[in-house]
């Protein structure tokens, strides 16, 4: 497990440079005329992942339902386990026209590296849902059950497993499952879902953890085999896949899916986004997205979202230290 890769360090240096160049473009706005400008929406990971899918679903609803009256510019600013994208947003201090979605890396990346920011620096809009994961292998492995996987991993001595980000919920899940089952892992991080899946199917990885939305098509096409689902209840689209709880595994975390503004964003902008996102999550399109992607609705606005982040950060840090990912 690489706790601080050269790639992560380089991405953080780039993020710092972007932060230094950024200036607030929201000066002069008031509650009466907000929003009146183009929105700069940052996705901190590459195309095709859970963060990307959620963000683009939100943007599509905002546009279709005419909830945001100006243009929305969406940019994938991936790199450094989210450090590049959220570092960019951090540099938009006070700007009500910059926004981003969150994932587990929003909490874990600052725990691992000197990003210059933490979740506490940003203006919270809300937690909208939590996301569980699927543990999958290549069908060519001939492994069709969780017990077969555990036996294989123990025989091999150490297995190569992959996920999104260096130290994130994906790593935590891999580490907790391996420790509780009694096998060893070599964790390989990726910034993009496509690269992760390609590495599994090419034989470079023994297994991956991914969100259901990202692998459901591959699973249904029999191009991957799901061995375990980390949610407490069976996945509706894959009812035959056992849950971690049913196999005796406890305490596995979920991915927080939320929305944030830059540090010191105006209170009127925070209020506007809370009110607007309440409309977004009430739409049939959002409810369909939640159901299709096997998300768990968990809605907390403003300060309640901050309280959730505080507890989750404490839990993640404890787990990462237990598994040797943090010193």
PLM regions with names:
Residues 17-20:
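C-terminal motif of bacterial Sec signal peptides marking the signal peptidase cleavage site
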Residues 1-9:
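Bacterial N-terminal signal peptides that target proteins for export
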Residues 214-284, 311-314, 319:
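C-terminal lobe and pocket-closing loops
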Residues 158, 162-166, 170-241:
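Ligand-binding pocket segment of bilobal, Venus flytrap-like solute-binding proteins
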């Amino acid at each position: 497990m690489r706790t601080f890769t050269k790639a992560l360090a380089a991405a953080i240096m780039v993020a710092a440079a972007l932060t230094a160049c950024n200036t607030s473009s929201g000066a002069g706005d008031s509650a009466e005329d907000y929003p009146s400008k183009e929105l700069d929406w940052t996705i901190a990971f590459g195309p095709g992942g859970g963060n990307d899918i959620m963000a683009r679903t939100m943007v599509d609803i905002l546009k279709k339902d005419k909830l945001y009256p100006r243009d929305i510019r969406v940019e994938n600013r991936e790199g450094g386990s989210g450090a590049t994208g959220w570092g960019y947003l951090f540099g938009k201090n006070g700007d009500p026209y910059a926004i981003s979605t969150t994932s587990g890396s929003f909490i874990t990346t600052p725990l691992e590296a000197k990003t210059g920011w933490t979740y506490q620096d940003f203006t919270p809009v809300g937690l909208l849902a939590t996301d569980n994961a699927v543990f999958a292998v290549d069908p060519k492995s001939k492994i069709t059950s969780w017990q077969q996987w555990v036996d294989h991993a123990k025989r091999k001595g150490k297995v190569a497993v992959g996920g999104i980000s260096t130290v994130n919920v994906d790593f935590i899940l891999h580490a907790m499952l391996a420790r509780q089952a009694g096998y060893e892992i070599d964790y390989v991080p990726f910034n993009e879902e496509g690269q992760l899946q390609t590495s599994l199917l090419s034989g470079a990885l023994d297994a991956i953890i991914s969100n259901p939305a990202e692998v459901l098509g591959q699973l249904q096409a029999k191009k991957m085999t799901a061995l375990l689902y980390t949610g407490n209840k069976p996945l509706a689209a894959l009812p035959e896949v056992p849950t971690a709880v049913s196999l005796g595994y406890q305490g596995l975390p979920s991915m927080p899916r939320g929305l944030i503004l830059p540090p010191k964003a105006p209170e009127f902008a925070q209020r506007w986004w809370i009110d607007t996102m309440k409309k977004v999550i009430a739409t049939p399109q959002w409810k369909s997205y939640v159901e299709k992607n096997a998300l768990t609705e968990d809605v907390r606005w403003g300060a309640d979202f901050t309280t959730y982040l505080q507890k989750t950060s404490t839990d993640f840090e404890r787990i990462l230290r237990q598994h040797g990912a943090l010193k």
